[in-house]
Amino acid sequence: MTTETRFLYSQLPAIDRLLRDSSFLSLRDTYGHTRVVELLRQMLDEAREVIRGSQTLPAWCENWAQEVDARLTKEAQSALRPVINLTGTVLHTNLGRALQAEAAVEAVAQAMRSPVTLEYDLDDAGRGHRDRALAQLLCRITGAEDACIVNNNAAAVLLMLAATASGKEVVVSRGELVEIGGAFRIPDVMRQAGCTLHEVGTTNRTHANDYRQAVNENTALLMKVHTSNYSIQGFTKAIDEAELVALGKELDVPVVTDLGSGSLVDLSQYGLPKEPMPQELIAAGVSLVSFSGDKLLGGPQAGIIVGKKEMIARLQSHPLKRALRADKMTLAALEATLRLYLHPEALSEKLPTLRLLTRSAEVIQIQAQRLQAPLAAHYGAEFAVQVMPCLSQIGSGSLPVDRLPSAALTFTPHDGRGSHLESLAARWRELPVPVIGRIYDGRLWLDLRCLEDEQRFLEMLLK
């Protein structure tokens, strides 16, 4: 060991001495004595490794308390951090999909703070059913006879098939064998549910007679799957639920539908593309309809199944139902969200998903122009900051070909180097409240459709 190495080792402080320093008192109060000591030991090991490798001390050895504070502060951050979503995708799966209404947030907080009547009937002091209150709401909204709630729509489809078609065949059009994110495929779900898939028709055209010819003594269901995350256009043919229900009645085979996104209101009244609604399919005679709670409905992650009472009863009594049931927080948020639909005149104001989807391009353009000046003053030395028209998307597999006119702030490096865009995007991801945009066509785009808190946005970007 050289004299220089010995000298560097001698500069490393003893843990006891560091802990006696006044700057460590607050750290010990905040993070606990055990964790602070554990980290100091780790840092001493790191420092010794640096000395052995490069014959120098780490820069942070000049202020141990500051480095400990920085590391423990970062460590204490939640893995689920709030972000500002300016990607242009409203229901961004990776960012948690639907924002919850204030009523839903309050309902969840109340359900977490105290015991609730989850499975308790106040009328006779007996055991109740956890889905009952929501089932009544869903029946009122959709016109269904009964309803069942599980933890997501994939679970809803699995339960629906396992409880009504295990060991039997399910007839589905070839053009509706969808795959959603995470390689969730309808054929795979059928296998897990113990069903046999019977494909009919072709990718682009399926006729009523295709279903008729497929039905046999082992057929349990005729199934429709709404292709909410892709669109087949051109020379196409598909039969709707009403026609399939008529065929099912003739052949004595129930019809079920996986709607996926599942809007409970006619979106066209807000200037958005229309999506099929559960209540329309119930009115057409479909026996079971499944859809998501956290997409166009604007609530928490949940799988909702509405339909005929005798079919729902089979789902409720199946062993999978207990494994897939929703917890009290989900049920509280979903109930509060569904109650908003009882007052449709205020829905676009109180439901964040609908509020963001219905923001006009003109309003967003004015907002972008208002924010452009301070950002150009701050970033103008390196980037040209401009207001540009753009197209937002709904996201989460909803209305895949439809786009919403919007406006964005774009950042273009004066030297044209793409690495500067990557660096800027990385800097924004490290902010206390990360700002998430997207890089496209030599620019960093911040689509402002989902920006409601301008003050927080500017506080982050002008740091």
UniProtKB/Swiss-Prot annotation:
Superkingdom in the source lineage: Bacteria
Tagged with keyword Disulfide bond: no
SUPFAM superfamilies: PLP-dependent transferases (SSF53383)
Gene Ontology BP, a term: selenocysteine incorporation
Lineage: Bacteria, Pseudomonadati, Pseudomonadota, Gammaproteobacteria, Enterobacterales
Protein name: L-seryl-tRNA(Sec) selenium transferase
Annotated metabolic or biological route of this protein: Aminoacyl-tRNA biosynthesis; selenocysteinyl-tRNA(Sec) biosynthesis; selenocysteinyl-tRNA(Sec) from L-seryl-tRNA(Sec) (bacterial route): step 1/1
Keywords: Cytoplasm, Protein biosynthesis, Pyridoxal phosphate, Selenium, Transferase
EC numbers for this chain: 2.9.1.1
EC top class, as a word: transferase
Cellular component terms (Gene Ontology): cytoplasm
Record flagged with keyword Transferase: yes
Functional description taken from the UniProt entry: Converts seryl-tRNA(Sec) to selenocysteinyl-tRNA(Sec) required for selenoprotein biosynthesis.
Family of the protein in this entry: Belongs to the SelA family.
Subunit structure as annotated in this protein's UniProt entry: Homodecamer; pentamer of dimers. Binds only one seryl-tRNA(Sec) per dimer.
Main location: cytoplasm
Modified residues (N6-(pyridoxal phosphate)lysine): 295
Pfam hit, one: SelA
Subcellular location: Cytoplasm
Cofactor requirement: pyridoxal 5'-phosphate
Alphabetized GO MF terms: L-seryl-tRNA(Sec) selenium transferase activity
